[in-house]
Curated annotation (Swiss-Prot):
It holds the Pfam family PAPS_reduct. Gene3D superfamilies: HUPs. The gene is cysH. CDD domains: PAPS_reductase (cd23945). It catalyses: [thioredoxin]-disulfide + sulfite + adenosine 3',5'-bisphosphate + 2 H(+) = [thioredoxin]-dithiol + 3'-phosphoadenylyl sulfate. This is Phosphoadenosine 5'-phosphosulfate reductase. It comes from Aliivibrio fischeri (strain MJ11) (Vibrio fischeri). Keywords: Cytoplasm, Oxidoreductase. It is found in: Cytoplasm. GO terms for molecular function: phosphoadenylyl-sulfate reductase (thioredoxin) activity.
Length: 253
């Protein structure tokens, strides 16, 4: 597979860009997750970074990427509303894996946001989307800019939701390469990887949580619920980080 220049790809039309990336994705599907990370670091233009919410299975990507490049910046967008167990999990994994952690937050504090806008997460889809833009999307863009990121690693998996079922391993989102090494992994493969490296699930896993975000928009799993229904009251699956709005040159996939 050829080396890819971001500037060259961004000069193409959406259709040309998508076709070019599709050719590479066919080959990436044949590689292991570890081989994909190595390929990305050797063949994609720009500085790497890994975004992590330190959710249920976060240790997988943190181990996978830092084992190959130990000083990779780890980006956390902290809303201020994470579970206490999440903050403890962040400290645990940062110490265990010697992570190069970078924390980014919204320009307005949680209390200031509530004073100005009320509890956005109680204001339907529109309120949730505004909340996510303020607390997740804008801080993430600032992180990508300040760290001069060209390769954005993420741990999204197709099995997690319908909105992720057709994602490619490699795309362009918000002007950078988006790379998903474990996209095709199953829950069983995740479990075996964590077991092999003696890595923990998030502490709330044992309390019945399948997915963990903010305290006010995360629900414990109950019989009959899908994983998607445990977040954002079932109104949304994505927090906005992984949705390309097209403003900064994305492949639209």
């Amino acid at each position: 597979m050829p080396k890819l220049q971001l500037s060259e790809l961004l000069s193409l039309t959406k259709v040309e860009q998508t076709l070019r990336l599709a050719e590479v994705n066919v080959e990436l599907e044949k590689l292991t997750a570890q081989e994909r990370v190595v390929w990305a670091l050797e063949n994609l233009e720009g500085n790497p970074a890994l975004s992590s919410s330190f959710g249920i299975q976060a240790a997988v990507m943190l181990q996978l990427v830092t084992e190959i490049k130990s000083d990779t910046p780890i980006i956390l967008t902290d809303t201020g509303y994470l579970f206490p167990e999440t903050y403890q999990f962040i400290d645990q994994l940062t110490d265990r894996l010697n992570l190069n952690l970078h924390v980014f937050t919204a320009d307005e504090s949680p209390n200031w946001q509530e004073a100005r806008y009320g509890k956005l997460w109680e204001q339907g889809v529109e309120g949730i989307e505004k909340y996510n833009k303020l607390n997740k999307v804008q801080p993430m863009r600032r992180a990508l800019d300040q760290l001069e990121v060209g390769i954005w690693f993420s741990g999204l998996r197709r099995e997690q939701s319908g909105s992720r079922a057709n994602l490619p391993i490699l795309s362009i989102q918000n002007g950078v390469f988006k790379f998903l090494p474990v996209l095709d992994w199953t829950n069983k493969e995740v479990h075996y990887f964590l077991k092999e490296y003696d890595l923990p699930y998030h502490p709330l896993w044992d309390q019945g949580y399948l997915s963990v975000g903010d305290t006010h928009t995360t629900q414990k799993w109950e019989p009959g619920m899908s994983e998607e229904e445990t977040r954002f009251f079932g109104l949304k699956r994505e927090c906005g980080l992984h949705e390309d709005d097209g403003e900064l040159g994305g492949s639209g996939i």
